[in-house]
Amino acid sequence: MKSLQLLEYGELNECLAFNEIDKPIVRSQDVLIEVKAAAINPIDKSIIAGNLRALLPIPLPATLGYDVSGVVVEKGADAAGFEIGDLVYARVPQEQMGTLAEFVAVAAEAVSKKPANISFEEAAGLPLVGLTALQSLNHVGIKEHDKILIHAG
């Protein structure tokens, strides 16, 4: 399958290339997602630039990406809650990465069904930034009816 891989650390437009890699092996708790959209987040850009080498050492070449949306095309025996053909989105675990590929195997517990009223692109853009926003609001103790100011966006 095709995968967008980081070949060496550097500039975003100079160190990535499409390579053929093996299709992921589906474990019993996994669903195999045919990728329709994947996001590149600030953490991916920091990894590409080499800024996180000390914290996240990864062997190169590496398939990056944490956020994905697509269609379930296979599932393990213990992957409850999903059927072949389900439209889904997910954030893969920190140690996994690899959503910038044609397929990604993800533990079913990290996957959700895609809301029907959003596109694959919108769904792929939600997991990491949505989690960050939610954690931030929870951290500062925002409650129902509190007012906040959101800059930009």
Predicted regions span which residues?
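Conserved hydrophobic/aromatic beta-strand scaffold that supports enzyme active sites
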Residues: 18-23, 69-71, 103-105, 111
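Hydrophobic alpha-helical segments typical of transmembrane helices
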Residues: 5, 47, 56-59, 68, ...
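NAD(P)H dinucleotide-binding glycine-rich loop of Rossmann-like/cofactor-binding domains
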Residues: 90-153
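Glycine-rich beta-strand-centered segment in the early N-terminal region that forms part
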Residues: 22-40, 52-95
